[in-house]
Amino acid sequence: MATPSMMPQWAYMHIAGQDASGYLSPGLVQFARATDTYFSMGNKFRNPTVAPTHDVTTDRSQRLMLRFVPVDREDNTYSYKVRYTLAVGDNRVLDMASTFFDIRGVLDRGPSFKPYSGTAYNSLAPKGAPNTSQWIVTTNGDNAVTTTTNTFGIASMKGGNITKEGLQIGKDITTTEGEEKPIYADKTYQPEPQVGEESWTDTDGTNEKFGGRALKPATNMKPCYGSFARPTNIKGGQAKNRKVKPTTEGGVETEEPDIDMEFFDGRDAVAGALAPEIVLYTENVNLETPDSHVVYKPETSNNSHANLGQQAMPNRPNYIGFRDNFVGLMYYNSTGNMGVLAGQASQLNAVVDLQDRNTELSYQLLLDSLGDRTRYFSMWNQAVDSYDPDVRIIENHGIEDELPNYCFPLNGIGPGHTYQGIKVKTDDTNGWEKDANVAPANEITIGNNLAMEINIQANLWRSFLYSNVALYLPDVYKYTPPNITLPTNTNTYEYMNGRVVSPSLVDSYINIGARWSLDPMDNVNPFNHHRNAGLRYRSMLLGNGRYVPFHIQVPQKFFAVKNLLLLPGSYTYEWNFRKDVNMVLQSSLGNDLRTDGATISFTSINLYATFFPMAHNTASTLEAMLRNDTNDQSFNDYLSAANMLYPIPANATNIPISIPSRNWAAFRGWSFTRLKTKETPSLGSGFDPYFVYSGSIPYLDGTFYLNHTFKKVAIMFDSSVSWPGNDRLLSPNEFEIKRTVDGEGYNVAQCNMTKDWFLVQMLANYNIGYQGFYIPEGYKDRMYSFFRNFQPMSRQVVDEVNYTDYKAVTLPYQHNNSGFVGYLAPTMRQGEPYPANYPYPLIGTTAVKSVTQKKFLCDRTMWRIPFSSNFMSMGALTDLGQNMLYANSAHALDMTFEVDPMDEPTLLYLLFEVFDVVRVHQPHRGVIEAVYLRTPFSAGNATT
């Protein structure tokens, strides 16, 4: 929202402009100019980096920042309260705008924290490749039950010989001359899994011996992808220990590594000629999968031949960090946890709470008007929530794969045949004989060299779509894999992580050639995503581990306090800080962090504050002038709005709203959007037990994304005045936001938004009214404004009515890339190459009949309808100022919103843009008085 249109009508009080110079009376302005040569006040009276050049009597006046330690603290289950005594000495002025809370504590982000995609363990392994493993097969014979141990895997380390001592890996030639003592593998860590043949060349024809390691049947099988077992010795060995019973009676039980050797010979070897070719060192290890899970499991967890084919998938990334600008950390708008700023002489609290003020959102929009939110500022944790536009709106322009991509075997040829050398017989020119000068075994390949083709571009694009779009589809589109048990609580990380989705829902051929967002994804919060760059940055500021000793600096946001000049006296300043991890922390998956084990504790909260580095006589003059009630400090809330939440039941389409009769003086208009009930906490309570969510909170941080669900809004005052005038495209008193069927051509920009609504938004945001369409100036087009976030889209789909050969083939019966992809699952490819039966071609000579679909998205911003007294002038838009009908009488207001149905309860978030100001008066030492004025909704004060 652009700054100028966001500010109230200044004429109501003695405020003249947007910077703090407008807060001052002419006398104070004159004083500032007179002292400007040796102390520049600048905006908001402060320039704390410039020290005075003369008249300074103490070194304390030069000190820029002081630390206040709390005089009292309360550490409760859900909150942490601190109280400070601010002693402002004579001839000093404390700048509240420079204060911040310096907080130290310990954060446990819980087991659901995973700050990266993929796995850190064996990430190059195929998803379905097992570790070298063993399993037991039980056979019921006629007379007895037999059990056999089966092994699958690889022995990679070459040795000189295999004896009962194991694999010989070398010789000790330092013994007596002529003797060579064999060196055998140290079974605690050898053969090492990372050691094998150094080259592909092995054509000498000798029968080598090999050794390797294998997991015993007692260690449950897991795919190699994601497998980790902690080392149990400094050489990297991983075997567990096993108990060894004493050999003598009364002896002590000991432990040894749980490692055994198993020897293997070729299957064709016969008794009497058996000799070991392979030895496997089998062991039990502490096998775990810290960052992956199984998505294909043919049987139960017991080891079996079928379970060799288990398939792994990495756990979903879940960044967890403090919210943007520490949203949610400090209590605002909460009756039971209201802050206090009171003079100790009067004990009047200058912080008056109004439930319908939104301090956090106001601060977000204020920052956006001041600077570039895309530039991060780590001190205040300023890294705005964002999303990858390519994920929200998919521009599927296909893949550039004109040339095939090959991969080749390591020797560049592939497996060959073994040939012996021959030559022409010397006595017979037509015969052949063995050539003794040529080796008897020559490996030669015929024909072209072996190659495999992989479409790298297609695989990258398909993988991007699955990881970034398909996995974030609503849960109704997902399923739980067979033989996998997930918790019943759908808000937990384990549940969200374990659910999988068919890649066919979001494949590379879906909407190919179109710029379109998936319809089921439109109502999914796009900021709850691992590509939320701001959240990722804030998460990484804390580090990459679960347990964090944090040290943060948090600013005060309440508009009546944050810019105050505190005059000499003694004051009580206290505030509450939340300990609810769902409110304080943000996760990219939005899981319930309370259930998933995250905790936060504070060890200290100190206050840092700055005194103006003024000369004493300058400060005393400033104090004398500010004590005068004509020089009260006035501040207005940037948003200057009363916010109201109206529930919208699931599948409802109409929301009527009534505001009782009142005088609408100083009213500036409406802003509105839609929120999900699940994503909106109750700010009035100290702890909301029903808030089981930790993603972005649009109500507080401005991550709105449901604006496209509004269809119409009708506004009627009881005076029955058709206030918007009669020169608009549509009927007065009704704004049509989008039209599905547009026979008259009222829509704009190749989408279903009406020209009427587009112009109203341009007018409300940039003052670009009915005089045409043009791009707003850069300084007005901020991150939260309309034009930057307006995204029109259109696509063609098959005309199911007029295309006579159309068949509605459902997802299980569609095939495309058959034989090269898994069937309805992110698992091993299956099937056979065959012509695709989906989608129908929309281009070329065989293009089928199609219809055009249009829509738009407009995230982050709020829809705005400006209001002026001129609208009450019976339809004529004039510049004659306030109409008497409007200014001197009260009116009731009825509004009706028409919205798209959603299958979950939502809220209409409606801002009445009013005049929200506080005047702070400090007549005597230790006395602070505040008067809040907000017409036409409410007012309050701290003077009685």
Swiss-Prot record:
GO molecular function, one term: structural molecule activity
Keyword match Transport: no
InterPro entries noted in UniProt: Adenovirus_Pll_hexon_C, Adenovirus_Pll_hexon_N, Adenovirus_Pll_hexon_sub2, Adenovirus_Pll_hexon_sub3, ADV_hexon, VP_dsDNA_II
Record-marked site positions (Involved in interaction with pre-protein VI): G769
Classification via SUPFAM superfamilies: Group II dsDNA viruses VP
Keyword Cell membrane (UniProt): no
Localization per Swiss-Prot or TrEMBL: Virion; Host nucleus
Alphabetical UniProt keywords: Acetylation, Capsid protein, Cytoplasmic inwards viral transport, Host nucleus, Host-virus interaction, Late protein, Microtubular inwards viral transport, Phosphoprotein, T=25 icosahedral capsid protein, Virion, Virus entry into host cell
Gene3D superfamilies, sorted: Adenovirus Type 2 Hexon, domain 4 (2.70.9.10), Hexon Major Viral Coat Protein, domain 2 (3.90.39.10), Hexon Major Viral Coat Protein, domain 3 (3.90.249.10)
Gene Ontology terms: cellular component: host cell; host cell nucleus; T=25 icosahedral viral capsid
Record-listed N-acetylalanine modification sites: A2
Family per similarity comment: Belongs to the adenoviridae hexon protein family.
Function: Major capsid protein that self-associates to form 240 hexon trimers, each in the shape of a hexagon, building most of the pseudo T=25 capsid. Assembled into trimeric units with the help of the chaperone shutoff protein. Transported by pre-protein VI to the nucleus where it associates with other structural proteins to form an empty capsid. Might be involved, through its interaction with host dyneins, in the intracellular microtubule-dependent transport of incoming viral capsid to the nucleus.
Subunit structure, as described in the record: Homotrimer. Interacts with the capsid vertex protein; this interaction binds the peripentonal hexons to the neighboring penton base. Interacts with the hexon-linking protein; this interaction tethers the hexons surrounding the penton to those situated in the central plate of the facet. Interacts with the hexon-interlacing protein; this interaction lashes the hexons together. Interacts with host dyneins DYNC1LI1 and DYNC1I2; this interaction might be involved in intracellular microtubule-dependent transport of incoming viral capsid.
Official protein name in the record: Hexon protein
UniProt source species: Human adenovirus B serotype 3
Gene name in the database record: L3
